[in-house]
A protein has these predicted regions:
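Short, glycine/charged-enriched secondary-structure capping and boundary segments
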Residues: 20-23, 67-69
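Short, surface-exposed alpha-helical segments at coil->helix boundaries
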Residues: 34, 38, 64-67
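Alpha-helix C-terminal capping segments
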Residues: 40-50
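Short pre-catalytic strand/loop immediately N-terminal to key active-site residues, enriched for Gly-Thr
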Residues: 24-34
Length: 107
């Protein structure tokens, strides 16, 4: 029997201004999916560890995009339940030498 690591948690959509801009300066955001447990599953998969992720995501195209982002790294997505209307979003203004990281959650 082969061992497998399963992570449980929320995957969120992260929106960040490009080019280290502030929220008040930007006109476009870079979109990336992540979250502590999802990031762990992706990291393990990158090291060749058999792993899966368990969560609930909406049936719409944003939910499917989150599923696809995990699948592309080789994470087993068979434990993902589909339903509901929303995915958590957070805005991340990246740290520079002059300012700290700024995070705003929208759940």
């Amino acid at each position: 029997m082969k061992n497998k690591i399963i992570t449980f948690g929320e995957i969120m959509l992260r929106l960040s201004p490009e080019n280290n801009e502030r929220f008040t300066q930007c006109h476009e955001f870079e979109a990336v999916y992540g979250g502590g447990e999802a990031n762990t599953a992706v990291s393990l998969a990158n090291f060749g560890v058999d792993c899966g992720f368990v969560t609930k995501l909406p049936e719409h195209s944003i939910g499917q995009s989150a599923v696809n982002s995990l699948r592309q790294y080789g994470v087993d997505i068979s434990g993902i339940v589909r339903g509901g209307d929303q995915i958590g979003i957070y805005f991340l203004e990246k740290k520079t030498s002059q300012r700290p990281t700024n995070v705003i959650y929208n759940r």
